[in-house]
Amino acid sequence: QESTVIVMLTRVNENGRRKCEKYWPDHREQTTFDNLIVSSINVSEYGQIIKRSFQLWNPNQPGKKLLVEQFHYITWPDHGVPITTSDLFNLRRMVIESQGNNPSPIIV
């Protein structure tokens, strides 16, 4: 579906427990999943939001690369809701700006 925006609302680890898998490579690194290469090209922090940019491509389809942006909200509590909403509104604004007119779905 060629989605270009991912929203992540949990930490990888919380209180010593694994909450999700880290499916992305470290900054300026790359990893391979079957026939898909994922390369990390940028990481920026905005308060409680980390924005990661990746380039994805299949080596069997040269010339076709997809830029994907992940927005990682890092302070959603394990139980309950965030104390303030300002970072959530910033997250929403950033996701909308990144998505633009792209009709592909946003992955949450």
Curated annotation (Swiss-Prot):
Start and end residues of each Tyrosine-protein phosphatase domain: 1-108
Source organism, top-level taxon: Eukaryota
Xref: Gene3D superfamilies: Protein tyrosine phosphatase superfamily
Enzyme type, top EC level: hydrolase
InterPro entries xref list: Prot-tyrosine_phosphatase-like, Protein-Tyr_Phosphatase, PTP_cat
CDD domains per UniProt: PTPc (cd00047)
Catalyzed chemical reaction(s): O-phospho-L-tyrosyl-[protein] + H2O = L-tyrosyl-[protein] + phosphate
Keywords: Hydrolase, Protein phosphatase
Residues binding substrate: 78
Hydrolase recorded as keyword: yes
UniProt KW Ribosomal protein keyword: no
Record EC number: 3.1.3.48
Pfam families: Y_phosphatase
MF-aspect GO terms: protein tyrosine phosphatase activity
Family: Belongs to the protein-tyrosine phosphatase family.
Protein name (database record): Tyrosine-protein phosphatase 5
Organism whose genome encodes this protein: Styela plicata (Wrinkled sea squirt)
